[in-house]
């Protein structure tokens, strides 16, 4: 399984922008934005990465994750979410825009304070996506060399007993007026693949 590093994310989206950029003079911005988004989704499908877009606002799972457990039980799962904003708009993503989440079929919630929620002393190099208020703002930009990444932290809810050897995460969210569902599957060797659910 090929990992989508930040560098490959930038290369892919940059190459796609150049490939469809020439069409802009002939067909208008909306057509170019839609073509760029469509190519990005197709690339994600081919490489085993959940990827989607709202025009030229593109987002994906990098297939990087970090679990925390107590004994045999999963207490927190952080997954890296990447965004490239090639629009002229500021887009705000809120934790509350994640309308549902499940780990191994059990309800899960987005956690803003891992220390308080799961007694995790810090995410270390895993930068949280959302701030303490549960928001992330993506500024406008046309920089092909800039993508933003951060970790969304999920925790099983209630009495759910999810194994530290979890097998699937599914979450649905609204971003820039579009609803998407991403599914991440953990393989026996610990590697993961992800996909956009139709």
Map each language-model feature to its residues.
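N-terminal secretory signal peptides and thylakoid transit peptides that target proteins
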Residues: 1-20, 24-27
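Short, well-ordered beta-strand segments enriched in hydrophobic/aromatic residues
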Residues: 77-85
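Low-complexity, acidic Ser/Thr/Pro/Gly-rich terminal tails and inter-domain linkers that flank the onset
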Residues: 38-72
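Bacterial signal peptide processing site
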Residues: 30-31
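Glycine-centered tight beta-turn/hairpin loop motif at sheet-sheet or coil-to-beta transitions
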Residues: 54, 107, 175-179
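The feature marks short-to-medium sequence segments in extracytoplasmic or secretory-pathway proteins
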Residues: 84-148
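Short, solvent-exposed beta-strand/turn "edge" segments of beta-rich domains on protein surfaces
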Residues: 63-78, 90, 141-143
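Surface-exposed edge beta-strand/loop patches
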Residues: 142-198
């Amino acid at each position: 399984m090929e990992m989508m590093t930040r560098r490959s994310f930038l290369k892919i989206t940059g190459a796609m922008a150049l490939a469809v950029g020439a069409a802009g003079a002939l067909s208008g911005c909306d057509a170019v934005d839609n073509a760029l988004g469509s190519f990005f989704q197709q690339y994600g499908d081919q490489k085993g990465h959940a990827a989607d877009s709202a025009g030229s606002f593109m987002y994906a799972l990098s297939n990087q994750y970090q679990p925390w457990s107590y004994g045999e039980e999963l207490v927190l799962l952080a997954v890296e979410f990447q965004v490239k904003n090639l629009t002229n708009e500021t887009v705000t993503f809120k934790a509350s825009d994640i309308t549902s989440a499940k780990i191994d079929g059990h309800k899960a919630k987005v956690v803003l304070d891992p220390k308080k929620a799961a007694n995790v002393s810090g995410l270390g190099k895993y930068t949280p996506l959302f701030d303490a208020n549960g928001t992330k703002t993506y500024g406008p930009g046309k920089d092909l060399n800039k993508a933003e990444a951060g970790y969304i932290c999920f925790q099983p809810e209630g009495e759910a007993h999810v194994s530290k050897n979890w097998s699937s995460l599914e979450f649905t969210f609204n971003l820039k007026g579009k609803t998407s569902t991403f599914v991440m599957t953990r393989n026996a060797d610990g590697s993961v693949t992800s996909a956009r659910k139709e």
